[in-house]
């Protein structure tokens, strides 16, 4: 409906909303970006990959559920995506499930408490580059001072310097589990991949973190990072949910989460 467009009409005045030249169920293109959706099958699992090419002044952004920062503020990925006119969105780090871990969104420092010294975060800088940091090595304020636009605190890093970064210690426990996954990666300074793999469904067994990292390497990313998975894992594109979100392993339904990463 037209009722919601009033809230976001301000975005059009920035000159970033452009008329799409391509807009289908698997492809989108306008003056600033092109996005294509492909589905792969690996390890008996469907993996949905959105390849983003930046052509103009578009950038990866984040949005909070209900435009509000808080521990108990959640909404479905698709709901938050629609509220910011996202073409492509994935669930973020679900910062609200934890009371520590750096949170920087669209350049705003929202949480500076460190989860622990070894916590690996993804930093997306103003120039579009990705970095992986450990919270023990740098403060959230220093990251913002260094040009961080987004800091996502989940992990682990999947690929660093083009190599698989998931080590054997990650393989104990959560890394071995096969479940839905969400990840983001950078190929070069204008090309990114948003990745969501299914799991716990009849069609998809699910990936371990090692398998996910190996798949990201196949996509030729230089840096890739694991975001919140399981029932949170959702990919939204051009008005539709692309994957099969599983709230409890049975229902195909979206989980409400704290935040999204989008264009």
Range-by-range predicted roles:
Residues 1-116, 120-121, 131-132:
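Zymogen propeptides
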Residues 28, 93-175:
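Active-site-adjacent helix-turn-beta-strand microarchitecture at beta-sheet edges
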Residues 42, 55-57, 95, 137, ...:
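Short, glycine-/Ser/Thr-/acidic-enriched flexible segments
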Residues 45, 57, 128-129, 186-193:
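Beta-strand-turn-beta hairpins that frame and shape the catalytic cleft
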Residues 47-51, 157, 183, 260:
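Conserved hydrophobic/aromatic beta-strand scaffold that supports enzyme active sites
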Residues 64-69, 136-140, 197-201:
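Short, solvent-exposed aromatic-acidic interface loops
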Residues 84-87, 129, 163, 189-192, ...:
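Loop/turn elements at helix/coil->beta-strand transitions in domains of secreted/extracellular proteins
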Residues 99-116, 124, 169-186, 191-222, ...:
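Conserved, well-ordered active-site substructure
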């Amino acid at each position: 409906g037209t009722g919601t467009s009033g809230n976001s009409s301000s975005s059009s005045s920035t000159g970033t909303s452009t008329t799409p030249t391509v807009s289908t169920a698997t492809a989108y293109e306008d003056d600033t970006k092109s996005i294509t959706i492909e589905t792969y099958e690996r390890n008996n699992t469907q993996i949905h990959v959105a390849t983003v090419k930046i052509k103009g002044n578009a950038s990866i952004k984040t949005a909070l559920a209900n435009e509000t920062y808080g521990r108990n503020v959640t909404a479905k990925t698709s709901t938050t995506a629609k509220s910011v006119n996202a073409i492509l969105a994935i669930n973020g780090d679900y910062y609200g499930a934890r009371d520590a871990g750096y949170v920087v969104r669209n350049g705003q420092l929202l949480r500076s408490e460190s989860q622990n010294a070894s916590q690996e975060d993804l930093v997306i800088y103003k120039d579009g580059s990705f970095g992986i940091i450990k919270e023990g090595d740098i403060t959230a304020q220093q990251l913002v001072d260094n040009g961080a636009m987004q800091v996502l605190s989940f992990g682990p890093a999947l690929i660093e310097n083009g190599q698989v970064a998931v080590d054997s210690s990650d393989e104990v426990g959560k890394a071995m589990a096969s479940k839905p996954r969400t990840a983001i990666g950078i190929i070069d300074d204008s090309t990114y991949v948003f990745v969501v793999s299914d799991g716990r469904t009849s069609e998809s067994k699910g990936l371990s973190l090692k398998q996910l990292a190996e798949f990201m390497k196949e996509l030729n990313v230089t840096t890739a990072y694991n975001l919140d998975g399981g029932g949170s894992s959702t990919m939204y594109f051009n008005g539709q949910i692309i994957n099969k979100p599983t709230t409890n392993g049975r229902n195909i339904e979206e989980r409400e989460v704290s935040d999204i990463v989008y264009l």
